[in-house]
Every structure is written in structure tokens, then in C-alpha cells.
């Protein structure tokens, strides 16, 4: 079967005609029907693309996103089987995005221009006349352009990006188009600050990547190959751009997820990204860590960035100075980590992002910044700050030193982001230093000594919070007396624990005494149960089992730790912070030893269990054979017993079935009899439960007795009920009569009071409204003359303006009318000339057709005559050969043949016909007339 005929030009022409008459929706629908027709499968995609482009342009103008999405998917489904089908899909997708972005830019520019025009006239437009006009003009908007128009186009643009991404996703032949659309979508979100759309875009890209990973194990055409370096690099570039846009939009959670995506893709990739790309990645990573308060990782990231930036050929000394200073400043801003810690670190995943095996320390970061290639570029002011904080730290002079250095630091743009972290570090160092020199100090004096100058200062309330945080993290041990506003520093970490232990022991003793009192009361109330009392006395004579709580366990461990540390000389003379550090290190060492012991015990237990398991398996193999024989014998016996039991059960079930059938038949007959009785119109009814176990005869007797009993009972109840009803009704009416009269009097009085109140309220309200209206009337009478004069002046001004405008518009209308008349007249003249030309051409074509028909008819007649002549001449020649004719006869025949050839040549020339562009032939070469042809024919016959 031949493929259907496609005429794309006709579809575009039809759409243009509909658009020209204002039927854009119909034009769009006609193009949609053409694109989604099945005959598109047989066409070359290049011939259909102009129709798709026209459809996209028209659909974007009309904002028919759903229709466009459906048409694109249908188009992809129809053409993807052809050779260049997917390439055409990519071109169509790019064209769609171009149309949408162009339209979006145009709408946004138009809205901005409208906003600028209205902003220019905001001050000059507020006049008394405009205020009066605003009373009767409904549209009083002064907010600039209509934001809803731009918002609707933003939504349409976003949905268009989503539709295209869904169209080209996870296809190896559309990877470049997919990457380009992803980049343009991210730029759209960044340009118009679309945070929610960017989050959904990032989630969509992750789903696409997950689907691509899932397809790696499948077999199919056009599957994305993630093992290809170019494909993986494209995905990696998308994630780098995603991270960059996340940071610019300040979507920190989304930025962190993008960092994880980049990390996993870099692990999959065999090639290292470019240094500039990695430098940008680490710069964004540092911003994310700064926002998440991961100061150590922030410093480590800046160090990696600096190493990559050193290979930049365009780097300047100022850049090295800036970035090296940031590394040292961020290291100084890292919180103190003097005390060792154990346990799970929630930031372990973040360490792996930077290739770190464990958590780095603050000192390591500072030493990292002190490396020669970094330290030589650091700003002198930052070096002075480092010397003040780490080398020459003195709590008494640090305030003045910082105050002298702070103005220079504030002049540096990168210092502002580390102010809070530096403040916390300095305050904690001050608190630790004061805890070593002071025992008890007033709170105001403490805060004055620990406070910092300038932007590093804090109010007392926030300083107290930092002090409590330092105590929580065990850098100081304090006791705050709010009555005397005094802070007491403890020098020994076990001192406050021992005090707390004494308090806890007293509370436990009180609880035990209360428990004994309660037990005594229960014993007094339980004298009636002698046996239980004796058992209770026997239990009391026994020693109570010790109850170990979590608090007791911790207290005992701390007491043991205290005894161990008291034997160390360095512990006695150390400061509080050094004691805490030594205690933690000792406790960690002991815990590690105990954990190692437990691991060793568990390994020994596992070895013994493994050996026992091997022994058991060896003996189990022998027992398995014996058990198999026993089981086989038991199975045969059970099978025989089961068959015998099945036969007995089958016989029993057959007997029971017969009995059930007989009982069912009997019950159906009884139920039928009962139903017929219950259908009759009488009061007595019989339930199925009443006739359980009775036969038909007994049921009939029961029915007769029920009917007799029901009849007598009904008569008695009717008589009694009538008497009761008569007496009760009379009694009710007598008793309620005085109550009804009393209620009527009270209701009458209540209604009269309500009426009087309502009447007075109506009169008062009417009087108040009248007075208010009279006041308004008196006020308006005073300004009425001014209002009339202003109205007349405005009316006169507006009428004069409108007269000028009307005159101008009338002149313009007349000029346009004359121009239109001339244009229509000229157009009609041209149409008439064109019609006349067409008629003349039609007549000429008709005349030429008639001449050609006549020529063909004459040519046919000449061919027939020539054929007859040739047959006759051939016969005559044969006869002359047989008879041996003379020379004169042969010469005559030659002349006839020559003339015949001339006739045939003339017929051929006539059949070819004269060309329209050729000139008229001369008389010498003209065709023979009909009379000349007849003479030649007669001569040939002779």
C-alpha cells in the first residue's frame, strides 16, 4: 500500500487563512490534528518541522501549554522510528523553548516599560481634579503594571520547561538538547528568583538520574550510558550549575543536596573536572559550610580552593592575600576543641565530601594556614589578630589590643561574616582565663572583664548565655547565685559532683523512709489476711536486693575515676580545663580497654560456638540417616491409617447427608405452613423458634390456642384502655387550665413591655439619625457654592479640550476615509485588470487547445493515407519485379517515394507544432495545403 499524500504547505496556508479572519484557536486545532495524524509516520521529519514550528509559535501566543505538551509527545511517538526523527524532536524542543523565552522577555520588558511610565507621573498626577475623578472611576490602581500578567507568563514558561524536560529525558540521542534545556531552566529560575520552581527542578533532575541508573541494567534502544565519560561530564556540569544557582538563590538545603549529587557523580567519573570548575565548587561549598556553622569544614574547603586557585594564571597578589587571610581568619573563628570527645559525629558525611577520614582539629586548621605558601600572603592585620588570640593571649590586655585592631579589620569586606564566631571564641577564652584566676566574682564585674569592644560586644543577657554554654560544654564549672549576683568558679570538676551526690543520697534516704512508712500502713490494714501477713514478715526478715539505677552507676564510675586521678601528681596542680581534659582522656582510655575486653570475650564466645556447631553437624549427619529411615516407616504407617480413616469418614458423611436432606425437606414443609399462616390478616404470629422440634399436627394445635388467647386478650385491653383514656383526659384538662391562664397573663405583660421598649428605641434611633442628617446638611450647604463653581469650571475646561480633540479626530477620520477610498478604488481597479487578464489568457488557452485538436485530427488522417499508400506502392513494386518492368516505371516509383517521404516529414513537423516563442515560418518552408496533399495522393495512385 502506498503511503498517504502529505501537503504541509496546505496545512500552513489553511492556518494562516484562519488567523487572518481572527480564528486563531481554530488554526491551532487544525495544526494539532495534522501533527497528531498517523500519516505523519510516513513523512520525512524535515518536511513536517515547519508545521510544528508554526504550531508552537501560535500555541505560545495563545498560552495553550497542555495542548502543546500533548502534541509534542504525539509527534515524538510518531517520528521516533524514522532515521532523523529524534534529531527533529530535539530541534522542535529547542524551538519551543526559544519561542517561550522570547515571549517571556517581551512581556517582561513591556511590563517594565509600563511601570516606568507610571512611576514618572506618580507625583504630578495627584491633583484635586484627580481626587474628585477617583470617586466615580472604578480603576484606581497606582501599583504599576499588572503583576498577574507576568506571573501567568512565568507559570507558563515553567510548565513549558517541565514539558520539554519530560519530552527529551533519558534518551541518548537527545542528551545535548536535554543538557541545554536544563541549563536554560536554571537560568530562568535564577533570573526571575523562582525558588520553589528551582526546588522542583532539582528533584526532577534527581528522578531523571535515578531512572537512568535503573535503565543501566535494562536492554533497549537509546538508553543513556552513564559509563560514557562525555555523558557523565554533562550530568556533572549540570550539578555544578545547580549548586551555583542554589547558592545565589540562598537555598542552602538544596545546595547541600546538590553537593552530595556532585560528590557521587565525581566518584563515578574517571576524569577529574577542570580546575576552574572545582575552584568554583569549593567556593560554593565554603559558603554552605559557613551557613551551616561547620567552621572546621569551612576552613578546610577554603584551603582546597586556595590550592586550586594557585594554578590560575590570571591570579593576582591581591587575590592571594584575600584568600589566604580568609583561611587563617576562618581557622581562628573555629570553636575551641581542647576537650576530647567520643561517640558518633553527625558531620562524618561532610568530612567524606572533602576526602577527610576523621574530624580535623582547630590546631590542625591553624597549622594548615601557617604553611609557608599560604602564610606569606596573609594580611598583616589578620596575623596580628592571630598573635593576640593564640600566641600572646592575655585576658587583661586583650580588650585594648582588639579595640586598637578592630577598625582595620572592619575595613576588610570578608571580616564581617566571621564576627559572631570570633566573638564566641574570644568570650570562651576569656571565661576560661577568668575561671583560673577568680573564685567568686560579681556578675557585672565578670561581664565587664570578659566583654569585647565594638562590633564584638554583647549585652549581659547574651554574655550569660555564652557563659552557660561554656559550662555545658565543660570548659568552666560554675555556680550562679542570683540573690547576691555572684558567680562561683570551681577548680575541681569532681567537687560539684560530690555535692550533688550528697544531695541525691539524702533524697534516696527520704524516699526509703517514706517507703517504709507506706509498708507499715499497708501491714496495719492487712490484718485480716493472716497467711499473707506471715509471708510478708518472712520476706522482710530477708536482706533486700540492691537496686542499681543509671544515676547510681554514673556516680560510682565518677567516684572510681576520681580515685584514679588523685594518684596522678599532674592532676593535683592542674587548672580546671586541664583536669577535665585529663579526666576525659583517662575515661576514654578505660572505656576503650573495656570495649576491647568485651570484643575479645565476644570473639572467644563466637569461636566456641563455631566449634560446637561443627561437632553438632558431624553428629547430626549420622543421626540424619537414622531419622530418615524412621520417618519413612512412620510415613507409610500414617498413610495406611489415613486411608482407612478416609473410608470411614466418607461412609459417615454419606449417612449424615441423607439425614440432613430428610430434615431439610421436613423443615421446608413446616416453614411453608408457618409462612402461609403468618400471611393471613390476624394478630397471632408464629416464630420459627417456637415450632422448633414440633411436627405439623402439634403446630396446628399451637396455632388454634394462640388465636383463641389473642382474641380474648385483645377485647380486655380495648375496654381497659378506653376507660383509662377518658379519665386521664378529663384530669389533664382540669389541672392545666389555671396554669394556662397564668401563663397567658404573664405573656401579655411581657409582650407589652417589649413593645414599649422597641417603640422607645425606634423613636430614639430616628431622632439621632435626623439630627446627624441635619448636621451633614448644614455642613454641605456651606460648601455647595464652591462645589458648583468648581464643577462649572471643570466642565468648561473639559468641553473645550474635548472640542479640540473631536475636531482633530474628525479631520483625521476624513483624511483616513479619503485614503481608504483611494486604496479601495485602486485595489478594485487592480482586481478588474487582473480578472480581464485572466479571461484573455483563458480564451487564448482555449483557442490553442482547439487548434491543437484540429492539427492532431489532420495528422491522423495523413498518417492513415500514408499507410495505405505505402501498402499500395509495396504491392506494385513486387509486381514489377516479378514482371520485369521497364526503367520509366521505376523512375516514376522513385518520384512517388520521394514525395511520400516529404509528406511524412511535413506531418512530423506539424505534429511537433509551432512554439509560442518562435517566429512565423517563411513561405518556402510552410506546410502543404489540403488541395496540394490531395493532388499528391492522386498522383501516387496513378
UniProtKB/Swiss-Prot annotation:
Main location: cytoplasm
Regions of compositional bias (Basic and acidic residues) in chain numbering: 836-870, 889-911
Entry's Gene Ontology BP terms: formation of cytoplasmic translation initiation complex; translation reinitiation
Compartments, as annotated in UniProt: Cytoplasm
InterPro entries to which the protein is assigned, alphabetical: EIF3A, eIF3a_PCI_TPR-like, PCI_dom
Region of interest called Disordered, as start-end residue ranges on this chain: 502-546, 836-942
PROSITE patterns: PCI
Residues in PCI domain copies: 320-494
Domain of life: Eukaryota
Gene3D superfamilies cross-referenced by the UniProt entry: 1.25.40.860, UVR domain
Keyword Kinase: no
GO molecular function terms noted in the UniProt entry: mRNA binding; translation initiation factor activity
Keyword S-adenosyl-L-methionine: no
Pfam families associated with the record: eIF3a_PCI_TPR-like, PCI
Functional note: RNA-binding component of the eukaryotic translation initiation factor 3 (eIF-3) complex, which is involved in protein synthesis of a specialized repertoire of mRNAs and, together with other initiation factors, stimulates binding of mRNA and methionyl-tRNAi to the 40S ribosome. The eIF-3 complex specifically targets and initiates translation of a subset of mRNAs involved in cell proliferation.
Protein family: Belongs to the eIF-3 subunit A family.
Subunit-structure text: Component of the eukaryotic translation initiation factor 3 (eIF-3) complex.
Protein name: Eukaryotic translation initiation factor 3 subunit A
Annotated gene: TIF32
